């Protein structure tokens, strides 16, 4: 008897888990509720603070030795950096401040904040339970639609959220299983989903497509670690499908013809229709946040003023960035805990 490879064992595990979820759904909910059972958590409880020891609580903000004479140290995720960096530089010049800006990821932001090595951290996901450090406050600056996109040669222009979940789980395996706008069918070739399963312990983002990584069980699934790799795979593969904010696509490929990708409508709605994202018709999005500290030896008044300034500037930002600002989110009935977005509208 042949030994099963670790990849095959992983695939079997994912498939069994997915079948268990479907079986549970089929016996407990109506058909039109199925999608919500596969959707992951949107936010974490804001009042549940992660415990740290006494030495950590007493520790002041201390910059890394490579950073000299800074008034502020900021670390931003790769989604916020291209938007916020020029605004911060302008603010620093106008106010005579020396501000050190680091481009990283949510994980890098979390690491620097847990070391108390930064005044402000930037996230592209809602905070996970371990991100909620004592004295750390989250300030949402906007949300951005997470687009499903395919190679520009693909004739498909729309999928339902149910079909998207079936594609990434492997239940739909060929493009011919999905009707296109003209009434015909796509290629009979295998769909090749591409997934970037980052920030696994933080809610929102890809968890809104499928709740956990084991549900991404398509046999032809390819995992990538970087946004550029995601875009490159789909640019070069007519059978591929992936997801990301289209702002990220435009950042790495300013010339749309170079990226060779196009966004699909989801449930008939486009990623660039803010009203449909706000009312819940478009169900996939990122939550963009900044942090500040409150408390003795950790609070920096420059940080509070800068975060307020950035929030105001993003209210007026060009629509090409695809960010829906806080004022519109509040007006649409989304829930906030202080300045932190913490719930979708009912």
Q: Can you say where each PLM-predicted feature lies in the sequence?
A:
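N-terminal secretory signal peptides that target proteins for export/translocation
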Residues: 1-11
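Short, Φ-rich (hydrophobic/aromatic) sequence segments
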Residues: 4, 21, 306-307
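Serine/threonine-rich, low-complexity intrinsically disordered segments
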Residues: 7, 17, 29-30
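Bacterial N-terminal signal peptides
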Residues: 15-26
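Exported/periplasmic ABC-transporter solute-binding proteins
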Residues: 30-118, 125-127, 132-142, 149-346
């Amino acid at each position: 008897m042949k030994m099963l490879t670790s990849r095959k064992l992983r695939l079997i595990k994912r498939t069994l888990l997915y079948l268990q979820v479907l079986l549970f759904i089929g016996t407990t909910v109506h058909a039109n509720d199925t999608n919500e059972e596969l959707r992951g958590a949107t936010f974490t409880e804001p009042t549940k603070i992660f415990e740290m020891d006494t030495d950590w609580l007493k520790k002041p903000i201390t910059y890394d030795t490579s950073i000299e004479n800074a008034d502020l140290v900021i670390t931003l995720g790769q989604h916020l950096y291209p938007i916020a960096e020029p605004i911060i530089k302008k603010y620093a010049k106008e106010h005579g401040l020396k501000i050190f800006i680091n481009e990283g990821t949510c994980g890098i932001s979390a690491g620097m904040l847990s070391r108390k090595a930064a005044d402000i951290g930037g996230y592209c996901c809602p905070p996970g339970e371990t991100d909620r450090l004592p004295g750390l406050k989250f300030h949402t600056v906007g949300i951005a639609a997470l687009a499903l996109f395919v190679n520009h040669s693909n004739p498909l222009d729309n999928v339902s959220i149910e079909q998207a979940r079936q594609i990434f789980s492997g239940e739909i395996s060929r493009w011919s299983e999905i009707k296109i706008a003209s009434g015909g069918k796509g290629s009979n070739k295998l769909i090749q989903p591409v997934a970037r399963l980052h920030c696994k312990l933080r809610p929102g983002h890809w968890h809104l497509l499928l709740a956990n990584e084991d549900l991404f069980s398509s046999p032809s699934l390819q995992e990538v670690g970087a946004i550029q790799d995601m875009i490159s795979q789909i640019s070069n593969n007519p059978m591929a499908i992936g997801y990301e904010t289209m702002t990220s696509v435009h950042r790495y490929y300013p010339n749309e013809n170079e990226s060779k990708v196009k966004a699909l409508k989801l449930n008939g709605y486009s990623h660039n229709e803010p009203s449909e994202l706000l009312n819940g018709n478009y169900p996939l999005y990122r939550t963009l946040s900044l942090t500040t500290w409150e408390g003795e030896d950790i609070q920096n008044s420059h940080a509070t003023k800068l975060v307020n300034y950035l929030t105001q500037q993003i209210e007026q930002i060009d629509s090409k960035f695809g960010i829906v600002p806080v004022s519109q989110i509040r007006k649409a009935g989304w829930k906030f805990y202080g300045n932190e977005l913490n719930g979708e509208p009912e």
